């Protein structure tokens, strides 16, 4: 299915359940994005308690800038490096914060360990598109889950359970507890079906989903920015001083490069699709997100081109269907991509999203592709992602980032 409006209707159809992650059940079985119906509503309702109004603004304006400054200062002092690796390091601590995974050592070696586990989890989320031996990948993911449970999750659970007992004993309030997904799940475990193994998968999924998608989005948008600004000094200077333009670049790149090029749904019962095709129970429907996001009826005759100044009809998201619709719309979309600005939006108070914040920081530090080291696509997956993207930072004899 490639038509934008038809794809949007299918994504909203509650008789079609998530089907993209069936192959990666070793990690994805029973996690939020794979639940359907009442179980999904119950779990999402709880986890939405973390992502209340003000949460995204707090993280974007108060928490993330400190983490980003530490990471980018090291990147600048090194004169650059691999943009993919930088993205992982910039985002891993943030995602652990809102997931509820403690890092008591706050050390380089601890971050390295988390990153190695997260990369293994990422193989589980993309198993349907893997080019490697899938049984070996499943074993690798399973071993990473066990290590994550022992090294990080159980200590985090024990600390939160102790805090929960203390707060409940003195009649305290919810605001006295950590504001993260793990705390919410532990406080409400009697309301949902979530055994020990399932909790490990849920937390691992939050860690990888929060970082991996944003990392790939970051590298894609920087590549698009490098291409769009090539030999145009006025564009480069505007990008360095106009965060609204950078956010539009993020949205436009997300439209062209959804984290998964397709969405998959399975029918819970017989369904008549917008194409007038009938789908029987348990049959699969594939939505071509990449094509739908480039539907010329919606995005114009040059829909396949990168244009951060593109105009949209009312009701059309600038990032297309890349963050999903309906019950499986991305729970962290506002954190990643910010809020779509209105004509009267105040740039000072606006939520740009962490991808735009990182991109702006890189641009202000003179980021540009490393001419001696070409970027490489990720050969381990069929997804069109960058596996390595060397860049330079700091002083540049030319004002051009390309």
Where are the language model's segments positioned?
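Cytochrome P450 heme-thiolate monooxygenase catalytic core
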Residues: 58-209
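Conserved cytochrome P450 K-helix E-x-x-R motif and the immediately C-terminal K′/meander segment
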Residues: 237-277
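Cytochrome P450 heme-thiolate "Cys pocket" and heme-binding signature region
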Residues: 310-389
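Cytochrome P450 catalytic-core helices
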Residues: 200-204, 211-238, 333-366
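N-terminal membrane-proximal hinge/A-helix region immediately C-terminal to the signal-anchor transmembrane segment
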Residues: 1-24
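Cytochrome P450
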Residues: 16-22, 29-49, 53-64, 103-110
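Conserved cytochrome P450 K-helix/beta-meander segment immediately N-terminal to the heme-binding cysteine loop
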Residues: 288-318, 323
């Amino acid at each position: 299915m490639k038509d934008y409006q038809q794809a949007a209707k299918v994504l909203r159809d509650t008789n079609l359940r998530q089907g993209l992650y069936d192959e990666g059940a070793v990690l994805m079985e029973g996690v939020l994005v794979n639940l359907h119906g009442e179980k999904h509503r119950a779990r999402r309702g709880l986890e939405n308690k973390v992502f209340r109004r003000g949460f995204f603004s707090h993280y974007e304006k108060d928490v993330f800038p400190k983490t980003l400054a530490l990471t980018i200062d090291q990147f600048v002092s090194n004169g650059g490096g691999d943009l993919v690796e930088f993205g992982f390091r910039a985002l891993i601590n943030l995602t652990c914060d809102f997931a509820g995974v403690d890092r008591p050592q706050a050390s380089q070696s601890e971050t390295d360990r988390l990153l190695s586990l997260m990369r293994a989890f990422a193989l589980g989320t993309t198993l349907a598109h893997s080019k490697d031996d899938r049984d070996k990948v499943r074993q690798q993911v399973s071993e990473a889950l066990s290590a994550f449970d022992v090294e990080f999750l159980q200590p985090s659970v024990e600390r939160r359970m102790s805090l929960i007992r203390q707060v409940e004993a003195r009649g305290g309030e919810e605001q006295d507890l950590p504001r993260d997904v793990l705390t919410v799940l532990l406080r409400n475990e009697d309301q949902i079906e979530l055994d020990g193994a399932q909790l490990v998968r849920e937390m691992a999924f939050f860690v990888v989903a929060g970082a991996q998608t944003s990392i790939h989005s970051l590298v894609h948008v920087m590549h698009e920015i490098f291409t769009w600004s090539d030999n145009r000094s006025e564009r480069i200077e505007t990008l360095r001083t106009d965060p609204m333009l950078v956010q539009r670049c993020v949205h436009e790149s997300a439209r062209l490069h959804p984290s998964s090029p397709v969405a998959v749904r399975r029918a819970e019962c017989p369904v008549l699709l917008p194409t007038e095709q009938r789908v029987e129970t348990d049959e699969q429907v594939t939505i071509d997100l990449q094509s739908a996001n480039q539907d010329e009826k919606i995005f114009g005759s040059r829909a396949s081109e990168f244009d951060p100044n593109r105009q949209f009809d009312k009701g059309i998201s600038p990032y297309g269907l890349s963050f999903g619709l309906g019950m499986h719309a991305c729970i962290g979309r506002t954190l990643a991509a910010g809020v779509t600005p209105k004509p009267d939006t105040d740039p000072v108070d606006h939520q740009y999203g962490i991808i735009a914040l990182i991109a702006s920081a890189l641009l202000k530090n003179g980021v540009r592709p490393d001419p001696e080291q070409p970027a490489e696509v990720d050969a381990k997956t069929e997804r069109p992602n960058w596996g390595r993207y060397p860049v330079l930072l700091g002083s540049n004899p030319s004002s051009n980032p390309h």
